[in-house]
Every structure is written in C-alpha cells, then in structure tokens.
C-alpha cells in the first residue's frame, strides 16, 4: 500500500538494485519491481551499470631469510602439524602467519554457523556424549543400541547423568561453542532456522558415530581433547636445536577390549567433505600435491599416533599398538567403512612400523624451514 501510494503521482521513477552476491545471499530485484515490470502499461527501460574496474595482476615476492627472519625462527621452539602443513603447501603463507605473525580475524557471528563452528559443536557434542551418556569404562554394543533407541543416558543413577538425553548434550554444545556459555549450561538464545537445521545435522552425525563404534565394540574411550607433545632434535647450521611438536587429540580409544586384537586408535573427527584416501607411502604425507587434492590431516594423525605409541605413559601404560584414524563422518555410512589410515592398501595396525620413515621426512622439512639458503617462496 505505502509503495503504490508513494509512486502514484510520479511522472518519472528510477529504481536501482544491486545484483552482486554477498556470502550466501544473491542480489535481485524486489517483488514490487517484478510486479511493475509485468503489470504496468507504462514504458520501462532497463539499464545495467557496471563499474569499470580492471583487476591488477600482483605477483607475490620471495622472502629471503635475512637476519631478522632467522632470529625469529630461532625463537620458535614449537611446530604444530598445522604449521608444518602450511609450510609444505605454501612457504610464503607460512612466513606471513608464523614469522610475520599476521593472523586472520577470528570473529563469531551468532546468527550463522560456519564450517569451523559446526566442527567445534560436533567435537564438543561427541565428547559430552561419551562422557555423560555412555559408560566410562567398557562400552558394549548393547549400550550403544540403547542410546540409539531411547536417546537417553546409559550411565548409572549415581553418576549424576542418568537423566540426560542426547538433545541435552547437543544444546549444551551449542550454548558453549556458538553462544560462549560456560560448560554445563544448556540454556541459550532461540535458534534461527539455519541453526535448527545444523542442530538436526549434528544429531544425525552423532547417530552415525554411534553406529560406526558399534562395529568395533566393545571399546573404551580413554580420553578426549587432551594435549600431546614430543621433543625432536634437528640440525641448524651444523648445530643441534631442540624443538617440540604435537597438538590436541580429539579422541583416544581402545578397540577390541580384552582380546588379542586390542589396540589404541587416535581418532580425529572430520565433518568436512574432503576424505583421506589410501596413501602409497609415508612420503606422500609430505607431498603438497597430495595435501591439496586429498587430505592435509594424515601427517597430523600419524604424528599423534606415534606420540601415543612411544611417548605417553599416562594414556598408554601397557604399550598397546596404536593406529591413526581420520573419521570423516559424512562418508562413514557404508558397512565396510573404517576410519583407520592405510598405506599401500594395508591398514595401519601399528604406527611404529613407519616411525623411521616418518621422522626422517618430518626432520627434513623442519631443517628446510631453518635453512638460511632456502627462501620462502609463493606457491607456483
């Protein structure tokens, strides 16, 4: 009404709209404009205005390792798998992020759930599910079936969690990761439409995770979200330098409990669409072409597994064999799916078999980062 009242006595009317896209929203003319175009008998002229911009071709420059860069490198004593993968895929990106210390902004839009926040919510929900809804010791197929059927905690009345449901822990995860509430809080602002859809997807993924674990039950979850580190010695200008590498393990579990097949798995949850394929060799984990096309998480999974197999008496006191596992929840529907990594089509049942080759490649990369004669070059 107000729109038509506004234009009813006008002799010349100009409407403008922006057709550019912003995020997931596309610019388009309003329904009022579409109505005028189809119903009016007056002449309508359509013009398209374009900004005469020409993109400038900019070539990234090589950064030489001068005295200031080498001093900064000498100060760095900890190298995460993410940092190492960044160097492998783009040396210049590594320089800007870890030497020049130029960071990306880390803003959370509570009206949106991007891939990073979605992954954080799923990680937290999975951790809470195993801590509050399933037995703390050995988890059987029967326990998992009960949770899948009822959605209710299988823990004892004395645990304090007997009344919790799967919906409760998902709400707690949203409150914690999206709305920055304290752990244990389930109350949060009302979810919008997109957030409600993501909530249903999280629940679906948790059901998928339970069905995957049922195949290897009985199992025991040893820990969630805990840090691991390993010391390394590298050569820099002929001298030894002591550094550390490591990170945080999403989940460490023991499968085939109380059998001769018992072993530990370092499980890394992945909610994205990229999937890790079978490796031909350890060298492929450090190949930028493999990291770009397939998965850049294999080296991280191998490193964490080696730490658990050789350097973690707290979580692996019995020195069980350890397998690296990348659990891509989107691709885990088939009955023969296994998250355990493979090399040359052979499933890795004991990561220490590949320890020598892995540490050799890892050391080579770290020494290359410190080599003053090798500049930081952009990806070709």
Region roles according to the model:
Residues 1-8, 24-31, 79-82, 86-94, ...:
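Generic recognition of stable, solvent-exposed alpha-helical segments in well-folded globular domains
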Residues 125-232, 341-349, 353:
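A non-catalytic, helix-rich entry segment at domain boundaries
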Residues 30-132, 242, 370, 374-380:
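C-terminal, charged and often intrinsically disordered regions of DNA end-processing helicases
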Residues 92-104, 170, 174-175, 263-283, ...:
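Active-site-adjacent bridging/hinge elements
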Residues 69, 73-83, 101-112, 134, ...:
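Glycine- and acidic
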Residues 19-21, 29, 36-57, 293-294, ...:
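Metal-dependent nuclease catalytic regions and adjoining charged, substrate-binding loops involved
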Residues 1-46, 271-273, 277-292:
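Conserved C-terminal motor-coupling region of P-loop helicases
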Residues 223-312:
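Non-catalytic protein-protein interaction segments used by genome-maintenance enzymes to assemble
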């Amino acid at each position: 009404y107000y729109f038509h009242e506004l234009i009813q006595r006008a002799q010349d009317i100009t409407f403008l709209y922006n057709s550019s896209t912003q995020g997931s929203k596309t610019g388009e003319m309003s329904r009022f404009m579409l109505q005028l175009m189809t119903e009016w008998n007056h002449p309508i002229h359509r013009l398209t205005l374009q900004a005469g911009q020409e993109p400038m071709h900019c070539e990234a420059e090589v950064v030489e390792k001068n005295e200031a860069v080498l001093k900064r490198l000498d100060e760095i004593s900890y190298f995460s798998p993410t940092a190492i993968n960044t160097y492998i895929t783009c040396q210049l990106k590594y320089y800007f992020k870890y030497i020049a210390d130029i960071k990306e902004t880390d803003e959370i839009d509570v009206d949106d759930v991007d891939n990073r926040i979605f992954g954080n919510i799923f990680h937290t929900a999975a951790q809470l599910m195993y801590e509050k809804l399933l037995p703390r010791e050995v988890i059987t197929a029967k326990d998992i079936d009960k949770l899948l059927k009822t959605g209710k905690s299988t823990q004892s009345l004395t645990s304090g969690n007997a009344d919790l449901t799967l919906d409760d822990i998902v709400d707690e995860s949203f409150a914690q990761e999206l709305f920055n509430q304290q752990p244990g809080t389930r109350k949060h602002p009302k979810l919008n439409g997109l957030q409600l859809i993501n909530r249903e997807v999280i629940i679906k993924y948790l059901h998928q995770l339970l069905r995957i674990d049922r195949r290897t039950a009985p199992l025991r979850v040893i820990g969630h979200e805990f840090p691991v580190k390993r010391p390394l010695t590298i050569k820099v200008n002929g001298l030894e330098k002591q550094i550390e590498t490591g990170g945080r393990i999403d989940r460490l579990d023991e499968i085939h409990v109380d059998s001769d097949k018992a072993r530990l798995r370092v499980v890394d949850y992945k909610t994205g669409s990229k999937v890790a394929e079978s490796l031909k060799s350890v060298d492929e984990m450090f190949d930028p072409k493999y990291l770009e096309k397939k998965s850049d998480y294999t080296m991280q999974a191998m490193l964490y597994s080696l730490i658990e197999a050789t350097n973690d008496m707290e979580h692996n006191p019995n020195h069980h064999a350890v397998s690296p596992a990348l659990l891509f929840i989107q691709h885990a529907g088939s009955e023969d799916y296994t998250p355990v990594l493979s090399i040359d089509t052979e499933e890795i049942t004991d990561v220490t078999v590949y320890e020598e080759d892995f540490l050799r490649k890892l050391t080579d990369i770290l020494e290359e980062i410190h080599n003053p004669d090798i500049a930081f070059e952009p990806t070709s």
